[in-house]
Amino acid sequence: MKLSDWINRKRHNGGYGIQSPSSFFFITQVLKERLPYYSYPILDQAVGGNRAKKRHFRELFRITNYQQPANCISVGSATAACTMILAKPSVAHYAVTPTGLTAGRQSLLNEKGCHIVDSTEQLRTIIDKVGTIGMLYINTIDGADTLIRAALPHTNKESVIVVDGINRSKTAKLWWQQLVDDSATVITYDFYNYGLLLFDKDRIKQHYTLKR
């Protein structure tokens, strides 16, 4: 990471330098929340892996719990699908081409009523079915840019899109920057490993970069 990037992330770390009350609350009380959730043990078991991976998906859990989306769609990650369905089990869930679909994760998704589809071509059908996206998680898989472009017209002020792997490659960085600059997105967050896109047109367009 370049020194200038590190300084920028350091300046914003912990919510400092953020003037928007809603963004400050989101960062300090949601993203950096330290109190345990009752679902964490089940979540950690479903996620597996090291501490960093568990922290990453605990953040996704808290974001989902905070946003209270009307529906949840994950593309390219069974772990993300499990995370969102544990955080908000009462709405429709769709898992598109979920990589890492172990027997345990599939059992959890089936138990909670998640609709699992094996082709990204079906994402458009799912979006048409739900009408407006509640929460969409998408990994930087091949064709992800096209999928998100198809999703953007189906967002509103309550929608959130989580883009994983935004700094994974030069191509991913360029693609992420294009999304940040897009007129459809309003509030965007760069958490280094992943980014968030929000669409509330009542707010001023703003981008935040935080140290991970």
Show the residue positions of the predicted features.
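Short beta-strand/loop segment that forms part of the nucleotide-sugar
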Residues: 162-164
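A short alpha-helical cap/connector motif
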Residues: 1-157, 167-212
